[in-house]
Amino acid sequence: MQNFGKVAVLMGGFSSEREISLDSGTAILNALKSKGIDAYAFDPKETPLSELKAQGFQTAFNILHGTYGEDGAVQGALELLGIPYTGSGVAASAIGMDKYRCKLIWQALGLPVPEFAVLHDDTDFDAVEEKLGLPMFVKPAAEGSSVGVVKVKGKGRLKSVYEELKHLQGEIIAERFIGGGEYSCPVLNGKGLPGIHIIPATEFYDYEAKYNRDDTIYQCPSEDLTEAEESLMRELAVRGAQAIGAEGCVRVDFLKDTDGKLYLLEINTLPGMTSHSLVPKSAAVTGVGFADLCIEILKTAHVG
C-alpha cells in the first residue's frame, strides 16, 4: 500500500455543518485505522492549521464541510503549508460551494439546470413568482446540507422568505420546482458511480431527511431509471464536475421532471461520509466497502 505517512483527518471546523463533519470524520478515521493508516483526528476549531506541520502530519484527509472547509479557504492554507490533501483545489472548491456561480458555469456550457433567479432587497418578488411559478424553492447559495432551503407555496410569500434567509451565506436563489424525483450521482477520479434515487418521507430531501430520519428510501441502483437515463446521469455528473475543475470524490445532485429530463441541481465537492451518506451507498453497489473507499479517496491527496 502507498505510504501516506502521518495522516490528519480534518473534521469539525467552524461551519453550521460542524456536527455532520465530526460524524463523517470519525467514520473515516476508524476506517483508515482499520487499514493500518497512521491517522489522527484534527479539528481546526481546537488547533490551528499551522500545527499540522509542527505535529509532523504528511497528508490531510479533508472532511470539513461548509464555510472554511469546502469553500477554498482550508485548501489554500494546505497549499501554503505544502501538505497534500484530498478533494478539489482552491478554485473548484470555491465555485462548488457557490451554487449561483456554479450554475452560471453549467449554463454557459449548455448543461441543463433548473430556471432560477437571484433575489435582492429591490427584487420585484411578484414578477419572480410569476416567472418561476409556485411552488418554488428558495435557498442560500453558500450553505450546504440543505441548511436554509425553503419550499415556497403561497402567493406573496417569496419576499418574507427572502427576508428570513438573507443573513445566510451567499446570494439567495429562487429556483423553479422540478417535481419528477431527486437523484444523486457520485464521481470518483473522473468516473461516474451508480446513481441513487432519493425518496424522502418528508416533503423534500431536507436536513432532517438527510441526517436524522431513518425512513428516507435510497434506491441504488435506481429502479425508475432506464439504462440510458442512468448512463446519461453519470455522463452529466462527470461533465458537471469537470466544468468547475473538481477532483477526487464529488457528488452531483439531480432533479428529474415529469417528462424524464434530468437537471443538474448542485455539486458537493466534499460529500458526507456518515452512515446516511450517499457516496458510500453508491460505492458499495460496485463492490467497494467503506474502508476501501476511504483509501481510494486518500490516494487522491495532492498539492496544486
Swiss-Prot record:
One term under GO cellular component: cytoplasm
Primary location class: cytoplasm
Catalysed reaction, written as an equation: 2 D-alanine + ATP = D-alanyl-D-alanine + ADP + phosphate + H(+)
Cofactor(s) annotated in UniProt: Mg(2+); Mn(2+)
Protein residues bound to ATP: 129-184
GO biological process annotation, one example: regulation of cell shape
Residues in ATP-grasp domain copies: 103-299
Residues engaged in binding Mg(2+) 1: D253, E266
Name recorded for this polypeptide: D-alanine--D-alanine ligase
Organism the protein comes from: Neisseria meningitidis serogroup B (strain ATCC BAA-335 / MC58)
